[in-house]
């Protein structure tokens, strides 16, 4: 995923964070589905920030400018990816293909540096909780390979354990609408599945 500032648009007119963090995984998954057989597993990378995300009517285009507004846009994309994970799990429930979400936690990458005056302070506060890239990848690997996760579907995991997702997210009113809106958007761009 990415967390950029200032707002950038793709050549298709989508906000870049939305395009990379949500639309690209959606498209890749949808394009690979016809090749998948029972036993295949799909793992999407989300973030605990999905809990503060919102899906608004201008989700695909808007974005916001400035250092402090990229976090809400990022959170919105992670909510969208979790909703996609849940919706696809429902659609694939009888096909033997599982799809789950992995929350790697705060991982020591360039993405966590905001180039802001408060970075040294946040580094001191969060450093004890920051994972190495290998530690961050462990949950996704667990979902992809472990026996424990082979029959799980539509779940969110963190630290290699199933996370309890709030009722509001598990039964999100916009889950099916987001799927439909994404399909419409991609058809408008000439992409069909």
Regions found by a protein language model. Give the residues of each.
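Non-catalytic terminal and boundary segments that flank Rossmann-like NAD(P)-dependent oxidoreductase
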Residues: 54-55, 168, 173-193
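Rossmann-fold NAD(P)H-dependent dehydrogenase/reductase core
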Residues: 1-115, 188-193
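C-terminal helical subdomain
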Residues: 77, 101, 124-163, 170-176
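Generic recognition of well-ordered alpha-helical segments
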Residues: 87, 139-142, 181
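Short glycine/proline- and charge-enriched loop/turn segments
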Residues: 59-67, 116-125, 160-163
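Short acidic, glycine/proline-rich loop/turn micro-motifs
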Residues: 9, 166-169
């Amino acid at each position: 995923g990415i967390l950029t500032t200032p707002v950038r648009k793709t050549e298709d007119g989508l906000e870049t964070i939305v395009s990379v963090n949500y639309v690209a995984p959606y498209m890749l998954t949808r394009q690979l589905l016809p090749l998948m057989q029972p036993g295949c597993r799909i793992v999407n990378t989300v973030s605990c920030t999905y809990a503060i995300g919102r899906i608004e009517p201008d989700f695909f285009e808007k974005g916001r400018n400035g250092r402090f507004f990229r976090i809400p846009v990022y959170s919105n994309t992670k909510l969208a990816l979790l909703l996609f994970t849940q919706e696809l799990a429902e659609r694939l429930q009888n096909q033997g293909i599982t799809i789950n979400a992995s929350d790697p936690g705060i991982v020591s990458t360039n993405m966590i540096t905001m180039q802001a005056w408060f970075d040294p302070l946040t580094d001191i506060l969060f450093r004890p909780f920051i994972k190495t890239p290998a530690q961050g990848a462990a949950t996704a690997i667990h979902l992809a390979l472990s026996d424990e996760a082979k029959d799980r579907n539509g779940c969110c995991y963190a630290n290699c354990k199933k996370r309890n997702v709030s009722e509001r997210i598990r039964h999100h009113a916009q889950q099916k609408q987001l799927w439909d809106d994404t399909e419409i958007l991609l058809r408008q761009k000439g992409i069909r599945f």
